[in-house]
């Protein structure tokens, strides 16, 4: 029985993970649940899943949870950064679902990697920010990292067994691979008039045509920054060059990504757009378990279509690709700026089209020396956030 820690337990990925656990309760034990401030949701899932530990990042939320939890459950409530890092490194823990959104998830995800855990990586920002440091930590500790993002999980499933064992140091050309084809739906504004994008609301941006996701990733999907971050993540996970990575718009979200081989073959992974499928795959790899997802009905799908991305419509995607070419400093800055600009948009402070403007300004103006430690990364992240906040204030 695997002992599981879920980072970001009250979020969308956390809920899907617990759903898969429920379908396979004889194989998994929830050792700990980790959340930030959502006490009501944490209380609900603690009562249902009975973890040994419930960790709240917010100290006030931890106090409130401790007060509300029935004492007979004997769940230990903890808070604090050191306690969280100790929790993911605990000898009793086998697997860590890394699903805290954004830069906030980097320290705990990296701690799990350094502890040699089986890490189910849903926090793409960890690789976007720490890249080489992350890969080096994984190789040094012997940690197993499995990609949860549907696209990267699809790519992983399309690789040979040998290449699957070489995450972070894959030799794609040696495996006969010519291109990784990263698919994306194009989001809710794919067919909107360009002139209307500046007036799009947070509610419209969060109404994804195919996926049910949290607010931040929904806005990122609307701008295709999410695909840009996934492009950067794919670069590190699969040791891919810019020439080996291509983005393909696929509005139906049925093909989750593809791998093109030298001999002309293209292998694709298909399925209904439901995160429980890649989560179940990662949790059980190399075996297969039930995810609770309905099988794909090809007769209902009807057609599959593909488009080249329009960078005039999706400038954030172009920025991310350029940042990936420039290196770690650029991707760290872009990620930080995007978190600030998206939050400002969600709060009604800026227009949807201002997200790309702020991201580009930050990308061009915030610079740093080489990043050799996690402290270097977090310092640059903080610097980029401050610049982006100032840019937001100028646009209000």
UniProtKB/Swiss-Prot annotation:
It comes from the Bacteria. One of its GO terms (biological process) is isopentenyl diphosphate biosynthetic process, methylerythritol 4-phosphate pathway involved in terpenoid biosynthetic process. Gene3D superfamilies: 1.10.1740.10, NAD(P)-binding Rossmann-like Domain (3.40.50.720). Its cofactor is Mg(2+); Mn(2+). NADPH binds at residues 10-13, 38, 123, 125, 214. Mn(2+) binds at residues 149, 151, 230. It is an enzyme of class 1 (oxidoreductase). Its EC number is 1.1.1.267. Pathway: Isoprenoid biosynthesis; isopentenyl diphosphate biosynthesis via DXP pathway; isopentenyl diphosphate from 1-deoxy-D-xylulose 5-phosphate: step 1/6. InterPro entries: DXP_reductoisomerase (IPR003821), DXP_reductoisomerase_C (IPR013644), DXP_reductoisomerase_N (IPR013512), DXPR_C (IPR026877), DXPR_C_sf (IPR036169), NAD(P)-bd_dom_sf (IPR036291). Catalyzes the NADPH-dependent rearrangement and reduction of 1-deoxy-D-xylulose-5-phosphate (DXP) to 2-C-methyl-D-erythritol 4-phosphate (MEP). Belongs to the DXR family. HAMAP family: DXP_reductoisom (MF_00183). This is 1-deoxy-D-xylulose 5-phosphate reductoisomerase. The lineage of its organism: Bacteria, Pseudomonadati, Pseudomonadota, Gammaproteobacteria, Alteromonadales.
């Amino acid at each position: 029985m695997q002992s599981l820690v879920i980072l970001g337990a009250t979020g969308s990925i956390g809920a899907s993970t617990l759903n898969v656990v429920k379908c396979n309760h004889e194989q998994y034990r929830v050792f700990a649940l980790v959340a930030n401030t959502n006490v009501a949701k944490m209380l609900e899932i603690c009562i249902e899943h009975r973890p040994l530990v419930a960790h709240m990042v917010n100290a006030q939320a931890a106090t409130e949870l401790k007060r509300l939890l029935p004492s007979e459950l004997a769940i230990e409530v903890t808070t604090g950064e050191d306690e969280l890092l100790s929790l993911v490194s605990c000898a009793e823990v086998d697997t860590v679902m890394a699903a805290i959104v954004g830069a906030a998830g980097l320290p705990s995800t990296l701690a799990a990697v350094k502890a040699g855990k089986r890490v189910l990586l849903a926090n793409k920002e960890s690789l976007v920010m720490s890249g080489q440091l992350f890969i080096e930590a994984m190789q040094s500790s012997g940690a197993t990292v499995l990609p949860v993002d549907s696209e990267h999980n699809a790519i992983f499933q399309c690789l040979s067994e040998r290449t699957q064992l070489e995450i972070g140091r894959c030799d794609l050309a040696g495996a006969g691979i010519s291109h990784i084809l990263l698919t994306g739906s194009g989001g809710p504004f794919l067919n909107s008039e360009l002139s209307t994008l500046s007036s799009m609301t947070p509610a419209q941006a969060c109404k994804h045509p195919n996926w049910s996701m949290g607010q931040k990733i929904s806005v990122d999907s609307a701008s295709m920054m999410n695909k840009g971050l996934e492009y950067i993540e794919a670069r590190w996970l699969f040791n891919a060059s810019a020439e080996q990575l291509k983005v393909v718009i696929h509005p139906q979200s049925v093909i989750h990504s593809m791998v093109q081989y030298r001999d002309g073959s293209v292998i694709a992974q298909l399925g209904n757009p439901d995160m429980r499928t890649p989560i179940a795959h990662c949790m059980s790899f190399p075996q297969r378990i039930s995810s609770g997802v309905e099988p794909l009905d090809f007769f209902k799908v009807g057609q599959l279509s593909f488009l080249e991305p329009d960078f005039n419509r999706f400038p954030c995607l172009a920025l991310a690709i350029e940042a990936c070419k420039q290196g770690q400093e650029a991707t760290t800055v872009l990620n930080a700026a995007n978190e600030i600009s998206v939050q400002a948009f969600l709060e009604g402070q800026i227009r949807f089209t201002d997200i790309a403007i702020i991201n580009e300004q930050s990308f061009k103006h915030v610079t740093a020396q080489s990043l050799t430690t996690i402290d270097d990364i977090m310092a640059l992240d903080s610097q980029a956030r401050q610049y982006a906040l100032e840019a937001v204030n100028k646009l209000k």
